[in-house]
């Protein structure tokens, strides 16, 4: 246990070795801006201390941290440094405890900052006493620690294909969530026992290389090579991409259905919101950035750029359109309200044009500054290509019928602008500027 600090230092260097102090300053500045923004939202919403006692607050904290840690750890196991870590004479328990701290700082803090700002804000305006503030900060901190450790346990069992243990820990977590809703007094003791189990029994055996890829991976390797199959192979084998896409599809459907039920948005706007939420899903849009390690090989092979681009576009647009159709069918079935033909065509145009723009933007300005996939998925740069899609949504203001003609024109103008930019995935002269 005495080597936790050196391991933690190495893990932080693995994430931030290229930028160093610049990354630290950028993260600190981002947290300050986020804190100011969230304080403004709390003030505008008039949130009081009664919100702290709501069950959904604890459940949101648990689920959010678990989801983010699960994505991070499953992506982490794909990195080469993890194979080296398995060979080094270091304590497995110390490694994963140190990794839990790194995950909190790098992945969870900015997503769950609200839970720590809220008690401090209420203390600042005199709503909470000092003792109450410490109580809520301690409570949220405890559940943060629990959810991170649980996420590490769940993701390791998933990666190592320990299905029985995966289901067992998932069942315990379900009991924790039920306890938080029905028996709050039993929640913390149950979490404490689960933490001890994870740290004492599971953590010491987690620093072992996972088994090789399964049958799907072998089938794809034996099949005739094509970039389209290659994208599907990557998507199926990448837990981060697969889970992020599934969660975003579920969230977009749930969020839109709630907005429709409360009457905040009308039916037409709801389906546009679904399109926007699906389009913001970034891991499946960074199909050139993810090729960083294979870039030089792809450049030297006799490959037509258009062949690669259209294969990636077919994959990406197919995922977006398929997800949209599924969400629309479920929302329409539950609400009993079907989507109009014009709105359906409008949303499909948004998705197809948005996919083309995001993919073109990623080809012309790929992000090669990452060292691990975890950095690519969690960095703010993943949303850069989404900004070019915003004019498409402005075109909606022209009305449904008119926007059907305006959206393709706006998309072509944006793509033309992007293609006129210097550099790109295949431009080796811009190698340093792209960060490769």
UniProtKB/Swiss-Prot annotation:
It is a multi-pass membrane protein. The chain crosses the membrane at residues 27-47, 55-75, 113-133, 134-154, 164-184, 187-207, 240-260, 270-290, 315-335, 395-415. It is found in: Cell membrane. Disulfide bonds: none annotated. It comes from the Bacteria. Involved in the production of the bacteriocin subtilosin. Required for immunity to subtilosin. This is Antilisterial bacteriocin subtilosin biosynthesis protein AlbD. The gene is albD.
